[in-house]
Amino acid sequence: MIIIGGGLAGWRAAEAAVSEGASVVLVCNGAGNSPDIHALNCPVLTEDSVEQYVNDTLSSGKYQNDRRLVETMCRESKSLKNEFEFDSVLIRPLGSTVPRCVSINHSIGAIALAQIKARLKGKVSLEYRTVTAEEVLEIRASDPQVKIIIATGGWCGKYSFSTNPPYLKGDGLEIARALGGALKDVDESHVQYEPTVRLEGSHRGIPVITTLLYEGARLLDPQGMEFLSDVRLNKDELSKAIFQNGGYAFYDLTHVPDERLKECNMDLMERVIKVAPAPHSSLGGIVIDPKCHVLDADGQIVKGLYACGEVTAGIHGLNRLGGNGGTAAMVFGSIAGREAALEIKHDRER
């Protein structure tokens, strides 16, 4: 099995595949955005439910999501609370009706990656390099039975001002297309902007978490006037509000408690930060089913080909609910690895 991609989705796929007895080669040129994932969604409160989580995700996506994928993600996310010792503090991301964003020291992405890599040490063959569509075609031609999982992330790295590493340019899309997979929603209208991204200094391109708007933070327009009448906007709506009020804003953290800023690993001396919306997540990509099989233009399974994480389409609709990027990577990474490994077992039994 070959897994292309070294973020959370790729490593979760590797762990699931290894647990099913598969031999795995993981090829990547970095961890993508995964180390920067602060939190993920998991319905752990008694007043929450899978159904409410599904509804929030569909509402945030303007009901353009693939409901089957949404239901799978929300249902399977419940198992994450048995895998990780989340902090007791829950966050309500913009667009959610109840708090369900959980983390470990506000660094779930980096911590989960480190834990998975430690568990898989010596069990996965790891190569750091870029994989091209031409190379994958040659591999498939020499071994038609090889299983391939694409977990290469999105394409927002192609923008000059972005939260993404510059190597995230959509390579996985070309690989899927070359192998017969269908693509959906790979256009500018399916790029989600992170509303509050640092514009200046050495931290340019680094987001400032929007959940602080619930905890005393304010957004000021270029003239220093507060312009938000409702902090319950989702990220898409918040980005539009900033664009309509001068194109950038000052994130005023003056009234956020010091302890809260320390928890977020923020400089207490930096109380007003110049921010602007920046491309953050690509919402379209490779078409998959709930078992992460890649589908062709006719909706048929492309045998032996799987995809998971931000490289896929359908989960988020027209707007990703805050916290769902990490959840989707975790859930569908595991599904892709397990299903690919089970297909290997099935091939051997025939």
Spell out what each predicted region is.
Residues 173-175, 179-268:
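An anion/pyrophosphate-binding glycine-rich loop and adjacent beta-alpha core
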Residues 1-9, 25:
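Beta1/beta-strand and adjacent pyrophosphate-binding region of the FAD-binding site
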Residues 9, 32, 225:
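Conserved Rossmann-like nucleotide-cofactor binding loop
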Residues 147-199, 326, 332-335, 339:
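Glycine-rich loop(s) and the adjacent beta-strand/alpha-helix scaffold that form part
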Residues 77-147, 151-159, 196-198:
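Conserved redox-cofactor binding core of oxidoreductases
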Residues 263-319:
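A glycine-rich dinucleotide-binding beta-alpha-beta segment and adjacent secondary-structure elements
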Residues 41-73:
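Glycine-rich active-site loop/strand segments that organize a redox cofactor
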Residues 18-38:
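Glycine-rich FAD pyrophosphate-binding loop
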